C-alpha cells in the first residue's frame, strides 16, 4: 500500500496583486513565478521531495519525509525574500488525489485564494514515519520523440503532439486510479501513483496509443521519498529505452543521486 503526503503551495491573493496598483509587465510576472518555483525546487530537492509547477500560482509537492517545521521554514523563507507570501496545506492518503483534496480543503476552509486577509496559512497532517513502499512514481516519455516529431515538425506542432499525449495520459490516470501526473519538460511526464500493478501501466500506455496515436514507455519505481521512487523510475525507464520494452518496474529503489 502507498502512503502519499502532498502539499499544495498557493500564492496568497496573487491575481489581485498582479494588477495592483496597475497591471504588471507580463515578463516580470513570468520571471517572478519562475524564480519562486526554482527556489522551492531547490528547497525540496535536498530533502528528497518533489515539487511541480502546475499553474505556478498553485504548485503541488510530494513531501514524504518533510514535517511541519520544514514547511514553516519554507514559508518563512519565501515571505522574507519575495513580494508575495504563500499558504501551505498538506494532506496524507493512499491515493495521491485524495491527499491533494485534503490539502486543498485545508486552505479553502480558511478563505478564498484571493482573500487579502487570508495569508500564510500553514495547516495539515504530516507523516511521522516513512517506509520503502510509501511512494510509487512512474516516469513516462514518448518513444523516439526526436525521430518522430522534433526532427520532422516545427516546434509548435511537436509541442501540440506532446500536449495531446500528456492530456490523454493525465486524465486517464486521474480518472482510473487517482494518480497525479505532471509534465516536466521535453517529452517527460512524472506520475505519482497509488499502489498499481504492472498491468495497470500497460493499460495506460495502450489507452494513450488508442486515444491519440502516440506511443509511450514508462519506468516505475518505489521508495520512501519522492527522490528515491523517482530515481528508481528513471532507471527503469532507461531499461525500456535499452530493451525496447514499454513498461519496466524497478526491482529495488535506486539510492544514489
Curated annotation (Swiss-Prot):
Disulfide bonds: none
Family per similarity comment: Belongs to the archaeal-type GTP cyclohydrolase family.
E.C. number(s) listed in UniProt: 3.5.4.29
GO biological process: biosynthetic process
Pfam families: GCH_III
PANTHER family: GTP CYCLOHYDROLASE III (PTHR42202:SF1)
Protein name stated in the entry: GTP cyclohydrolase III
Entry keyword set: GTP-binding, Hydrolase, Nucleotide-binding
UniProt KW Transport keyword: no
UniProt-listed InterPro entries: GTP_CycHdrlase_3 (IPR007839), Nucleotide_cyclase (IPR029787), Rev_trsase/Diguanyl_cyclase (IPR043128)
Enzyme class: hydrolase
Function, in words: Catalyzes the formation of 2-amino-5-formylamino-6-ribofuranosylamino-4(3H)-pyrimidinone ribonucleotide monophosphate and inorganic phosphate from GTP. Also has an independent pyrophosphate phosphohydrolase activity.
Recorded GO MF terms: GTP binding; GTP cyclohydrolase IIa activity
Catalytic activity line of the entry: GTP + 3 H2O = 2-amino-5-formylamino-6-(5-phospho-D-ribosylamino)pyrimidin-4(3H)-one + 2 phosphate + 2 H(+)
Amino acid at each position: 500500500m502507498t502512503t502519499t503526503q502532498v502539499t499544495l503551495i498557493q500564492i496568497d491573493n496573487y491575481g489581485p496583486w498582479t494588477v495592483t496598483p496597475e497591471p504588471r509587465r507580463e515578463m516580470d510576472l513570468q520571471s517572478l513565478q519562475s524564480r519562486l518555483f526554482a527556489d522551492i525546487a531547490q528547497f525540496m530537492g535536498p530533502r528528497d521531495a518533489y515539487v511541480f509547477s502546475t499553474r505556478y500560482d498553485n504548485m503541488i509537492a510530494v513531501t514524504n519525509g518533510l514535517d511541519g517545521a520544514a514547511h514553516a521554514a519554507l514559508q518563512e523563507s519565501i515571505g522574507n525574500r519575495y513580494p508575495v507570501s504563500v499558504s501551505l496545506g498538506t494532506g496524507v492518503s493512499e491515493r495521491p488525489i485524495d491527499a491533494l483534496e485534503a490539502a486543498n480543503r485545508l486552505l479553502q476552509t480558511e478563505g478564498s485564494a484571493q482573500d487579502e486577509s487570508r495569508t500564510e496559512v500553514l495547516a495539515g497532517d504530516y507523516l511521522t514515519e516513512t517506509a520503502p513502499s510509501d511512494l510509487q512514481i512512474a516516469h513516462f516519455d514518448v518513444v523516439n520523440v526526436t525521430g518522430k516529431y522534433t526532427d520532422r515538425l516545427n516546434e509548435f506542432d511537436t509541442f501540440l503532439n506532446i500536449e495531446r499525449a500528456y492530456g490523454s495520459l493525465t486524465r486517464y490516470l486521474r480518472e482510473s486510479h487517482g494518480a497525479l501526473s505532471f509534465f516536466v519538460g521535453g517529452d517527460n511526464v512524472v506520475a505519482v501513483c497509488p499502489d498499481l500493478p504492472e498491468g495497470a501501466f500497460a493499460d495506460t500506455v495502450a489507452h494513450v496509443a488508442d486515444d491519440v496515436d502516440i506511443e509511450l514507455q514508462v519506468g516505475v519505481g518505489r521508495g520512501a521519498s519522492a527522490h528515491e521512487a523517482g530515481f528508481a523510475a528513471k532507471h527503469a525507464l532507461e531499461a525500456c529505452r535499452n530493451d525496447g520494452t514499454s513498461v519496466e518496474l524497478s526491482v529495488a529503489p535506486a539510492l544514489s543521486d
